[in-house]
């Protein structure tokens, strides 16, 4: 057995805001916080909220085994480290997470998540760490030597290209974007602001102003119509036929992608296919009804990139 390989666990993100799919799709392992910049030997652990990034960059070696952890006791995939530490800015916004610290990892995704049955990674496992549980170490060592093992030599996929930043938002949206960027740091500061704003506040202060700036008049923007958080209408009266799309709002920083199923239920109740937007007031992800609700457009108002223009165009009043 490969007893010389260190066994690591790497979090795939919380259930409500997971990024495990990104790891498997791109044969990559990612870690944050990435916005403080590339790690190097002169950087302090304090710059990265602890020693996780330093250990990820320095102690992990090519050939080590990585378990893609989900929750306290499950794993989604087993991987083998295939590359040295890199800082990849194309992963600066993974479902809202800044995960630029990277290593290429060849993953073997399990048919179903493997449940160890107890909190083998600890009661509050860190985002990245070495594995100490004998049960888990034994599982990992046996897995990588058990056939099939061809996945450990598979060609690595090309990494996605970095999306260019948007130098200036469209003129109609400049005030809205500026206000969001001004308020965003404050809303996260519990000492200065207090409790995080509710979904209703985010709708009132961010979502509706964005729609107004995109040309929708107030009488054609409903709030809590048929339980839908926000719905713009192409014409009056407010009927399912005139509903342009369904917007489902979540609290700030929540996993907006996890709200898709709830929004799809609202669309089904309408009886007519409509695109869906899920948002926390800052991040907006659109799912296209014509593509079986596949993700089709995205914008992060505090990290605007050129593809955001597509989302703005889709949200404009026709």
Specify the residue positions occupied by each region the protein language model found.
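Short, flexible loop/turn elements at secondary-structure junctions
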Residues: 12-14, 35, 70-72, 83-85, ...
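Long, low-complexity intrinsically disordered regions
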Residues: 123-157
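Short coil-to-beta transition motif at edge beta-strands of beta-rich domains
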Residues: 56-69
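Short secondary-structure boundary/capping segments
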Residues: 24-28, 83, 95, 264, ...
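Aromatic- and Lys/Arg-enriched surface recognition patch
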Residues: 74, 80-136
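Compositionally biased, charged N-terminal/linker segments
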Residues: 1-58, 110
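A short, conserved, highly charged catalytic patch centered on acidic carboxylates
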Residues: 51, 61-62, 156-275, 283-318
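Switch/connector loops and helix/strand junctions flanking conserved nucleotide-binding motifs
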Residues: 19, 76-78, 87-90, 113-118, ...
